[in-house]
Amino acid sequence: MDIYPRYQTKEIKATKSASNELWHFKKDLWDVLEILEQGYPCSSSKRKSNIIENCIKKGNKIHKAVVANCGNYWLVIHFGIFSYKKRRF
């Protein structure tokens, strides 16, 4: 039995600060897996080639997960939730 969810056959783990962010928003690594599988790329800036930044829209909120490929596992380095507002021009 695996205690960590898997994405592309690699376990998903979290840094201490990302773990605190997940806890603050009452989310866990299974929510990160959902964002990675069903979300869309939403990188707002240039990232290293081994880093994935995916988002998923839930209601009027955007859930963002930033994970790094560390070879044998994925490491969550940031998790955040922010509001979504349509811009009017």
Where are these regions (language model features)?
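Ribonuclease/tRNase effector modules and their secretory precursors
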Residues: M1-F89
